[in-house]
Swiss-Prot record:
Responsible for the release of ribosomes from messenger RNA at the termination of protein biosynthesis. May increase the efficiency of translation by recycling ribosomes from one round of translation to another. One of its GO terms (cellular component) is cytoplasm. The keyword Cytoplasm applies. InterPro entries: Ribosome_recyc_fac, Ribosome_recyc_fac_dom, RRF_sf. It is found in: Cytoplasm. NCBIfam families: frr. GO terms for molecular function: ribosomal large subunit binding. GO terms for biological process: translational termination. Keywords: Cytoplasm, Protein biosynthesis. The gene is frr. It comes from the Bacteria. Its main location: cytoplasm. This is Ribosome-recycling factor.
Length: 185
């Protein structure tokens, strides 16, 4: 029972770190990356559909994204969706593919992105701490019901704290790496 609580907490913390990493992938760092367009949806036959389901996205050069729609009739809709997104990207359409040149980031924009990275980082840490709290609450219930002793409770909560510290250290390392990537000119 106790090991199950700790394992569940570890799995949830791992998922929180993975979600944080996916969130960071959507922040552009001056380089072209297909994940930039992950959250952009196109109105396709009345349904909001992610671009990645409507087209293949390739990166032929460091600052160029090429979007090749499977259905040429949606090219205008894809272009409109990219323009109306808050990514600040300008697509150019030649009738069969859309090219997006990724402009170099300004110093001001880099600082804004670093703030965003820090916000995502803090959100991920809060998620990990909430998971710790839930696990500790479950352990305290076991102690209250007499299933484990007070000393065992202390040992198990220390294990949960170590898990928390490890995951927060991972988040900090990922944050530092992304900040460096964003500030790189």
């Amino acid at each position: 029972m106790v090991q199950q609580i700790i394992n569940t907490a570890k799995e949830k913390m791992d998922k929180a770190v993975q979600a944080f990493t996916r969130e960071l992938a959507t922040i552009r760092a001056g380089r072209a990356n297909p994940s930039l367009l992950e959250k952009v949806t196109v109105d396709y036959y009345g349904m909001p559909t992610p671009i990645i389901q409507l087209a293949s996205i390739s990166v032929p050069e460091a600052r160029l994204l090429v979007i090749q729609p499977y259905d040429k009739s949606v090219i205008k809709d894809i272009e409109k969706a990219i323009l109306s997104s808050d990514l600040g990207l300008t697509p150019s359409n030649d009738g069969s593919v859309i090219r997006i040149t990724i402009p170099p980031l300004t110093e001001e924009r880099r600082r804004e992105l670093v703030k965003l990275v820090k916000k995502y980082s803090e959100d991920a840490k809060v998620a990990v701490r909430n998971i710790r709290r839930d696990a500790n609450d479950e352990l305290k219930k076991l102690e209250k019901n007499g299933e484990i002793t007070e000393d065992e409770l202390r040992g198990y909560t220390d294990d949960v704290q170590k898990l928390t510290d490890d995951h927060i250290a991972k988040i900090d390392a990922i944050t530092k790496e992304k900040e460096k990537e964003v500030m790189e000119v």
